[in-house]
């Protein structure tokens, strides 16, 4: 006889809450319902193995079907089923799961019971206007019953016509969720969430191309692999098995570099396979490729909190029943087990890298460029991993040779130790753009390493803290003599007037760009040194590079690029510029410079008159004279600058020297480059 009742919940509002907020993604309902069906099937296997069920188990599978016309999705199993009393106990009492009780009773059995989250069944109401449960227990003399509920706390329970044991969950999909009535949608979700469940999941028939269209065959379409690679013993797997499994997970990805097979049962349960992909120079594109499973049930691909952040760059599968989940299984909660699991995975990754480095260094070096970003990220974010990685991290020099920390220090400390005892590591970030700077260093007997990766600016700063008496300097950050200071700088023999004149002449021809700032500087580099070159200060450039990845450093990223235009005051060409100015311009500047000298002398007298007086005690006439003096000085300086600027604009040698320096630093482009070529042809 039919029976009506009220579901045992504390509030009439529980169903709207379930419908909207139980899970972040409504599609999770399919995983929950199919997982429950797998649970019921696993229970039957367990009961059979312990002799509590002696009947024929038959073909144990879970079948999923969609009826677009009837607007239903049905999930059927041939598991233990339920009696009327069990329906009352397990379905009508929200937050109590039969799997929880079953686990307690058979806790020593190996059967995997995944439905221990309490509310899983009720996820069906997120997409359904009504849910029917037709079920028949495996027990002898059991009769079938049908439970129906429309999403309110009221339900009906009545006898049903069902010949076999097991359960059919029939979800009547509401208008709002019609997308789930598309077979392609359901097949995609089954592939995502149920790909490795332990019981065969059948969804329709396999199809083939026939008579100009796709048609069903007689073969069942099994969605899942019930024995995926990570559940097997490593000894039973060949390299090709691991690669084939990787291709099944990531069909569009390149072949992995190598992998780690995880298999731990104490003090926590953890299995899985982690693959090292070829990591490109972009961290964000690589994330969220590790899939988390709980007893072969897909949970999420967002594993932050389970593994250290740098390990999210790996690919593969982690399966553990010891990772706590909230009611939705979508968000992870931190606990002691998670920390142990995280530490274990980090250790296994470091072990694997060190093993390859020690046993097959040529292969390790060959794959280093694809590993480097991953290793650097780990060193920057995980202290324990840094300690391990310090043994196998590799520097690469400009010729492609690779060295460990100790090897490289031994190589360079003899010639690259400065006067203060610091070992200076020279590096370039652009092999071609910084070629001239690299060549100068090489000619001096220095080694230059290539650090052109996304994280290299951060690694450089970290290593300066970690490595004793070590300083990293980019090869274009200063003149060659100053990169590794062996002695005090040579004195620049220019008068103040000559310095000021050269500054004005070269500033007049420097490019006008809001994003670039140039400062004219002077060095005594010898007559054989370059006449002019461009350097970029190490600190500011490094801060700008680091700002690209650290929002908190955005201030540096917004500053213009700052360069030094270094004039070699010993070079004949610089002397020629200065001599030309003295011959062509200085005669017309004699009176102006004399006037400047007079004005400065007058200014000094006025300042003397103000000494010891409060502002209100200074005569008005003195204040006015001081203001007039400043105006006259500015006017006279302006006249001098105008003449120097005009001379510089017409002087092809100055323009040529500046453009050569810009060209050597990769800063000469577009119209400026075209003009340089035209001018060079004229000069030739």
From Swiss-Prot:
Residues 330-548 are annotated as: B. GO terms for cellular component: cytoplasm. GO terms for molecular function: ATP binding; ATP hydrolysis activity; ATP-dependent protein folding chaperone; unfolded protein binding. Keywords: ATP-binding, Chaperone, Cytoplasm, Nucleotide-binding, Stress response. This is Chaperone protein HtpG. The gene is htpG. Homodimer. It holds the Pfam family HATPase_c_3. InterPro entries: HATPase_C_sf (IPR036890), Heat_shock_protein_90_CS (IPR019805), Hsp90_fam (IPR001404), Hsp90_N (IPR020575), Ribosomal_Su5_D2-typ_SF (IPR020568). Residues 1-329 are annotated as: A. Residues 549-684 are annotated as: C. The keyword Electron transport does not apply. HAMAP family: HSP90 (MF_00505). It is found in: Cytoplasm. Gene3D superfamilies: 3.30.230.80, 3.40.50.11260, Histidine kinase-like ATPase, C-terminal domain. The keyword Transcription regulation does not apply. Molecular chaperone. Has ATPase activity. It comes from the Bacteria. Belongs to the heat shock protein 90 family.
